[in-house]
């Protein structure tokens, strides 16, 4: 349903079982089935790439209009959604695990209750420049997150 709403859309997936370490081994079979299906959908704008180094991935995320991440019930933090938010990219997520803590619904993205809402909100964010700009601006103005190197220096001073 998302692709027909805008034929210029691309869904770039940078993933593989290596992305998730030991957790990835546990889910290797399922993730490989999903990625195999996704690779067959290239004509619908879906591109599957191998995992990237962190800095390279950040550059790809910054180029994105929206960050889509359904999440899982056992999600306890969701670093990828947090990183997208810090990079100023609005997210569309499902209300699993910690997603509602990562994304402020209707302010920095959408937290959806089911697949139907996920599709609807994704289309809205992709096609509505005003809503996208509002969410992007909220992310930028509230971006007071420190880099890890700065946090480490603060802790070094405290521990001296």
PLM feature segments, named:
Residues 25-55:
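Nucleotide-activated donor-binding/catalytic signature segment of Leloir-type glycosyltransferases, i.e.
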Residues 56, 72-76, 98:
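Active-site donor-sugar recognition loop in glycosyltransferases
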Residues 58, 81-86, 100-101:
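Short alpha-helical segment that forms part of, or immediately flanks, the ligand-binding pocket
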Residues 62-76:
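Acidic donor-binding loop of glycosyltransferase active sites
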Residues 75-78, 85, 95-96:
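Short glycine/acidic-rich beta->alpha loop that forms part of the nucleotide-sugar donor binding site
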Residues 90-93:
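Short hydrophobic beta-strand element within catalytic cores of glycosyltransferases
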Residues 105-116, 124-129:
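Conserved acidic donor-binding segment of nucleotide-sugar-dependent glycosyltransferases
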Residues 113, 129-160:
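A charged, aromatic-enriched C-terminal amphipathic alpha-helix characteristic of glycosyltransferases
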């Amino acid at each position: 349903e998302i692709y027909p709403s805008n034929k210029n859309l691309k869904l770039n997936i940078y993933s593989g079982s290596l992305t998730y370490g030991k957790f990835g081994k546990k889910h290797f079979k399922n993730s490989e089935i999903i990625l195999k299906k996704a690779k067959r959908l290239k004509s619908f704008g879906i591109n599957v790439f191998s995992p990237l180094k962190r800095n390279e991935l950040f550059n790809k995320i910054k180029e994105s209009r929206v960050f889509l991440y359904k999440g899982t019930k056992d999600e306890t933090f969701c670093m990828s959604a947090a990183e997208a938010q810090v990079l100023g990219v609005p997210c569309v997520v499902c209300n699993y695990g910690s997603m509602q803590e990562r994304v402020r619904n209707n302010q920095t993205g959408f937290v959806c209750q089911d697949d139907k809402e996920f599709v609807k909100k994704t289309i809205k964010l992709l096609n509505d420049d005003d809503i996208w700009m509002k969410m992007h601006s909220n992310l930028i103005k509230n971006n007071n997150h420190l880099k890890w190197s700065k946090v480490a220096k603060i802790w070094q001073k405290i521990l001296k």
